[in-house]
Structure formats: C-alpha cells, structure tokens
Amino acid sequence: MDQDYKAHFKVFCSEVREWEKIHVVGSLPVLGEWNPRKSFPLTKSTDEENTFHAIVSVPSSIKEFNFRYIRVMYLDPSENNTSEPIMVLSKWETFNNARTCLIGVESQDGVARKNITDQFGSYSGKTQITDGWILNEKESVVYFRIHGEALKFFAKSYANKEYRLKVEPFDVRYSEMFSYTRKDITDRRGVWRHSSVYASMSIDGDDVVNLPTPSLPCFSNTDLSVLTREDPIFGDQYFNGSVFRNDQDYLVFRTRTVSLQNLAFRIEFYHGEKRCALSYVLPSSMSGTHGATVSPVIGLSSAPVGHINVNYMIVKRNKYTDQNLDIDSMKTTFGRYWRKRNRMLQIGHRGMGSSYTKNIGQRENTIFSLNEAARRGADYVEMDVQLTKDLKTVVYHDFHVLVAVAGRDSPSSTPTAAGENKSLHEIAIKDLTLAQLNLLHFEHISRANGSSAESPVALSVTPSKTETDELHVPFPSLAQVLRHVDENVGLNIEIKYPMYMQDGSHECQGYFEQNKFVDIILAEVAEHAGNRRIIFSCFEPDICTMITKKQHKYPVSFLVVGATNRYMPFQDIRSDCSKIAANFAAGCELLGVNFHSEELLIDQKPIEIAEKYGLIKFVWGDDLNSKEVQKHFRDEMNVDGLIFDRIGEDEVLKQNVFVVENHNRSSLFARSQHNSRSPSMSRRCMSTVE
C-alpha cells in the first residue's frame, strides 16, 4: 500500500498582527475543502519572525491540490461562561487562481514543498490581499463615521482648537479595557489593563464592574480610513488619534465584534499628544443598524464641555448564507477580479435605454429590452433592482409609480363611460405587492409633472394588450431576469436604495432595514445566477460596503453623481464628490467606481485617483449618447466601460466581447488539436464522448 505524501506549508507574512494567526484552506479535506471555518492552523515559527508552518498528510491517490493562506483572529462573546472563541476572518489571499501543488510531481521521497517559503498574498507574480467577509451569525462589523459639523464646544477653553480623535472599543461588562495598542502588548498578545477612566470615576469602587476577564475580548482592534486624505486605506490608528476639522475631514472607524449588545466605544480627544477630553457611545445609543447619535464630550474636570455627532452602521451576516454553502467557499472569488482588455466595454443602460422619459421603443428594464441590448452586442446590461411590500425582488428604476384609480360619479354629474373617470395617484413600489404591480394599471412618475399619457415621446409603464408575454412584463423579478436574459451578456445589477437629497427631501421614506434588504437580493442572486458575470452597483455607499462584507464572489462598483447641475445632489458627500467617492471605493476594497460623465468632462482628477488605487472606471450619463463623447472617454481617459442608451442602434450587429473571446479560444483549441499528432482510435472515441 502506498504511503501518504507529506506536504509542507511555510509562509512569511510581514503585516500579521500580534493577535492574528495564519491558516491554510484548500481543496483537501484536511484543509477544509475551501470552508474557512474548517481551515488548518499553522504554527508560528520560534526562530523566524512572522513565519508560520505546518505539515499535513495527503493521500497517495491525490496528484494535485489547491490552497490559499488566510489571516484569522479569535474573539470571545463570553456568554454565560459557556461560549467558545469564534474565529473571525481578517485577511485572505484573493488572486483569482488559487495556489497549486502538483504533489505527484513536486514530491521527493514522498515529501513536497519542503524548502518553499511562500509570501502571504503574493503568487505567480500577483499580489492581492482582501479583508475578510462576515463568517459567523454572532459576528458584526461596526462602522463609525465622524464628518461634517460633528464637533460643537460650549466651553470657551475648548473651542477653536485642532483636535485629534481616537476611537477605542470596550466591553461594558468589565472595568478593564482590552488593549491592542502595541505599547501595551506583552508576549506579543493583546492584554487587559485597568482603565484610568474607571479609576477616576469612583471613590469607593462600588460602581465598578469586577467580573473576571476572559482571555480574549469580544471585539477586534479599531482601524481607520480617512476619506479626505491622500491615503484612504484602512489601517491602525496613531496612539494620539487622527486630526479632525469640522467640515473638512471624514473619518471612518471600523471594528468587528461577536457581542454587539455589550460593545461600547470611547472617543478620545487629543490636543497634540495630550488627551484632553472623552466621549462615550454605549450600546443603547445604537438603537438600530443604521443611524446617528449625539454624545456629550467630557473634559478633564469631568464636566461636559461639548458634544459630538457620530453616524454608525452595523453590518451583519447574510442570514441566507447557510442555505447556499457556496457563498462561504474560498475556491473562487471575483470580488476584486477584473481582466483588462484593449476594448472598452459597452453597457446597455436599463437594456436599450430609458423608455419612460425618452423616445425609446423598448420598455426599459424588461427582459425584452435587456435581451435586445445583448443581441446588439452589449457586453453588460445594467438594470435596477428593489423590493416590493411582500419582500419580492422587482426590476424597476423609480421608487414611485402613478396608479390609475377609478373614481365614483357624483350624484349631480352625468354618468361617464366606463374607464373615463380615472385619476393618477403616486404610490411607492415598496407599498405594493408583486401581484398588485402585475395587476393594476400604472403610469411613470414623470406624468405627475403634467406629461401627457398619450405623448409619443415615452412609453406607458403598463404594456398594451398585445404585449402579454413574460418578455414585456414591466416589473420582472430578479430571478426571471437571471433565468431568461442571454447568459453570454454580463449583468450590472444596480441596487436601488433611497437616500437624502441636499434639499432635505428623501427619495422614499420608511424603507427596509439595510441588512434585510441586501440579504434578500443576494440570496436570489446566489440561487439563480449560476456562472453569470455579475457586478453590483449602488448610489448608497453603505449598501456597497454591506455587499462586500456579506459575500466575496461578485464585485461591487460605487455609483456616484459627483458635481452636477442636472440633478439634485445627495446629502452624502461620498456620493456628491467624485474624488471622495474614489477614496471610499479604494478604502472599502470595491472593484471600481461608476463616475458621472458631467463631472469628468470638466475635471479628470477622479480618474487619476481611481488609477492610483487600481480601481475599474465605468462612466454613465446622458453625455454618452454622443458618439464623439464616447470616443473621448475611450481614447483620452482610457475608461473600462460606458453605460448608455440605444446601444448598437445605427450600427451593424456585432457580438459582445465574451462571445468573441470564447470563439477565439475554441478556434485556437481546434487548431492545436488539428496540428497535434493523431490520437489513437480509443482516444478519438473518448474525445467524441466528451
């Protein structure tokens, strides 16, 4: 009987933190079969800094296997003294093709990879490391944003000074504070230390909690991204925090936790290197998963000297993940993958274009329009997805429609013919069930501004009696689109989530909770997408962040309006300023940005920022209806794709880039087969079967 192979793993990781461990995950059962929760832990080397190693047995029947290295940390929810530490994924290798070991070829005397030291995140000439997504039901990622007029001081001695802010998480159950700060670390691990804050708050100590501290905290370190500086990448905080100036800076703090109900934050104010004030955000201050809170700022005399406004967002695990185990598989990831091509991609806006406000013959966001764009050579088609009252996905752009309602004839009026006494009333898509959307008669919301329903310029939302098949349904579900749109065309799924506008109005009040909303859409994609090429996009930056923290298979691009005179801008500066949008996309590790053509034709600086961080550059906007403008973006700005109406009209029908590439690969393979030595008869038979 053949003996098992011995496979050696040794990896150097220069940026591993003191509290992190390195695991290996891969195609072998001993490596977890791509499940990170079943990955194999490596041992830290005692004589080589930041180096980890392990040896595993591989059955002799295995000739090849694949693997990746991951960085993890353990957090303890400390619930009823019975909970076990939970593994949290910090970073992982995300090159498209995982590492390969041809163990049958590489092994000598049954031992493979004995003298190989891998570099974490680097393989085959590529370097790519990405933040981990949420793996556990109890795990959450908390984002704190401090920006705008966040600080207000009513004590004169504190006003008109420049402050540095630092955010430290703590567990409200313990008087000690766990420190990840390097100067507090002994034996290369985080430590619990008695907080000087608690010591100063009580004379006799009666109000101090003295529960025994667990060996591990329930929270991670807090890292920082500054969107208004040149380097927006998340990283460790300085010991005395980062400069914050009202109406100038935008600070984003990020922490993971496995005990959200016990997590609080201490905001430390520094003037130079001296701490001069504190503020606290307690669990009770965060009543939902998305909102804002105002906390008092306490000075050195323990008296309030001002207050600070903080926005927060809490991202939770996709509750449908356990129904589709492939979501957590590390075998393949496209979250940061993009193949650069010489040809700029053409993306059909809502299929063939905006039909309810422009003179376009195909009803927008229908299966027919999406397929027509694909038939005319679109590489991707863009479509809009939102939810109905009964939590069903629906492909439709606007948050509201006009519903035709038949009124009663008044007693004094002359009876009217059936259907004549109708009026249009505005109603939100979220307040209608999918069945109602497919039953009632609707007009586009633009008709509320006086546009005639008989106008030849735009189509009615409700199709005519001759358009009764599924292809022309104005409210198809996302599943219908995934099943019936040409599989050769990529899908740019724009997720519609309402936002506040600069004039104080809101696109659609009382909308769905963000985690619930995103989970439903991601679950439908996971169930029906198959091997489709998919890119998500959204104007709401927090939705973009959520998607990256709930899955890693599909990439995300941030939609931005930027500086504009055509539309009412959003309140959120991340969507209002393309430079900050590019920084946001880089910091959150998105694939790229969908820039608005209006701003880029005036200022190309956002393109330069995107290129600096390797972001993919898409462009949308009415300017792109001009062939000359399209040529300008292609030749002068070297963008990766354009999103526009009427794709392929007035042109000879062509195939999209993916069809052409597949055809070229097939032709190349056929030629290589033809030029190779003739196979044996048995081989010919096998080839015929395959």
Swiss-Prot record:
Alphabetical list of Pfam families matching this protein: C2_GDE1, CBM_20, GDPD
Renumbered residue ranges of the record's region Disordered: 670-690
Record keywords: Hydrolase
Enzyme Commission number, as recorded: 3.1.-.-
Residues of the GP-PDE domain: 344-654
Domain CBM20, residue spans: 1-122
Keyword Hydrolase: yes
GO biological process: glycerophospholipid catabolic process
Enzyme category, top tier: hydrolase
Record's compositionally biased regions (Low complexity): 676-690
GO terms for MF: glycerophosphocholine phosphodiesterase activity; starch binding
Protein family: Belongs to the glycerophosphoryl diester phosphodiesterase family.
Annotated protein name in UniProt: Putative glycerophosphocholine phosphodiesterase GPCPD1 homolog 1
Taxonomic source organism: Caenorhabditis elegans
Name of the gene encoding the protein in the UniProt record: gpcp-1
